[in-house]
Amino acid sequence: MNSILIITSLLIIFSIFSHALIKLGIGISNNPDKTDV
């Protein structure tokens, strides 16, 4: 039970983190002068 919960939460955190990184990278490459995320 606990291991499944931990793995699920890790997957969710990783997916959100990677999505944020990709969005941030695209935003920087497209708008270098823009500072807001």
Swiss-Prot record:
Encoded in the Rac prophage. It comes from Escherichia coli (strain K12). Its main location: membrane. Pfam families: YnaM. InterPro entries: YnaM_YnfT. The chain crosses the membrane at residues 4-24. Induction: Expressed approximately equally in exponential and stationary phases (at protein level). This is Protein YnaM. One of its GO terms (cellular component) is plasma membrane. It is a single-pass membrane protein. It comes from the Bacteria. It is found in: Cell inner membrane. Keywords: Cell inner membrane, Cell membrane, Membrane, Transmembrane, Transmembrane helix.
